[in-house]
Curated annotation (Swiss-Prot):
<protein>
    <recommendedName>
        <fullName>Prohead protease</fullName>
    </recommendedName>
</protein>
<keyword id="KW-0118">Viral capsid assembly</keyword>
<dbReference type="InterPro" id="IPR006433">
    <property type="entry name" value="Prohead_protease"/>
</dbReference>
<feature type="active site">
    <location>
        <position position="114"/>
    </location>
</feature>
<dbReference type="GO" id="GO:0044423">
    <property type="term" value="C:virion component"/>
</dbReference>
<feature type="active site">
    <location>
        <position position="141"/>
    </location>
</feature>
<keyword id="KW-0645">Protease</keyword>
<keyword id="KW-1273">Viral capsid maturation</keyword>
<dbReference type="GO" id="GO:0019082">
    <property type="term" value="P:viral protein processing"/>
</dbReference>
<comment type="similarity">
    <text>Belongs to the HK97 prohead protease protein family.</text>
</comment>
<keyword id="KW-1188">Viral release from host cell</keyword>
<dbReference type="Pfam" id="PF04586">
    <property type="entry name" value="Peptidase_S78"/>
</dbReference>
<keyword id="KW-0946">Virion</keyword>
<dbReference type="GO" id="GO:0008233">
    <property type="term" value="F:peptidase activity"/>
</dbReference>
<dbReference type="GO" id="GO:0046797">
    <property type="term" value="P:viral procapsid maturation"/>
</dbReference>
<dbReference type="GO" id="GO:0006508">
    <property type="term" value="P:proteolysis"/>
</dbReference>
<dbReference type="InterPro" id="IPR054613">
    <property type="entry name" value="Peptidase_S78_dom"/>
</dbReference>
Amino acid sequence: MPEIVKTLSFDETEIKFTGDGKQGIFEGYASVFNNTDSDGDIILPGAFKNALANQTRKVAMFFNHKTWELPVGKWDSLAEDEKGLYVRGQLTPGHSGAADLKAAMQHGTVEGMSVGFSVAKDDYTIIPTGRIFKNIQALREISVCTFPANEQAGIAAMKSVDGIETIRDVENWLRDSVGLTKSQAVGLIARFKSAIRSESEGDGNEAQINALLQSIKSFPSNLGK
C-alpha cells in the first residue's frame, strides 16, 4: 500500500496560533481539496472521511516526518470541511524540540505542513498531470515542515518501495521519495527497461543493471535514515 506525502506552504494552510501562542496551540489546513499541487496531483473532497471515521490509531505530529523521533505534539481535532482537512493541535509543553519548533513557526523559518497517508491501487486515478486521490486508506501523520511543496519530497521520502506494483508507481516513487524530476524518473525507468530487455536476450548486461541500482542507492534521500 503506497504511502504518500503532500505538503502545503503556511500561506495555503492558514496556520494561526491561539491567543498569544504561549500554549503552543495552533490550527489550519493540513490539506486543501481540488488543488493541483507541484506533482500535478489533486485530492478530492471527502478523501479523508474514511480514514477519519474508521482508523483507531491516533494521527501523530512530527517535525519533517521524523517518525523515529519523539512526537513534537498531538492533534486534538481533525475534520474535513468544504475547503480541506482542518486540524487543531498543540505542541508538547516542556519538550525542548517542540519549543524550538514553536519559535521557528512564529518566526516564519519553517514554511509548511504536510500529511503522510496510505492509499490502495483503487483509491486514485492516473491523469496526464499526475494522480487524483478520491480515498485515503489511513492518515499516518501530519508534520510541520521546513520546506513547502515539492522541496519536501527529498526530505520526507515517505513513499514505500513495498507498495510499488507498476512502472508508474516506480516513476512516482523516484520522484516523490528520491527527489528526481518527472523527466529524470522517466529517463531512468527507460534505462532500466533497456538493460533488463538486453539481459533477457542474453546480452549479459548484469553490470549495467547493477550500476543503475547503485546509482539509485547513492541518491540523496532519507529512506530509512
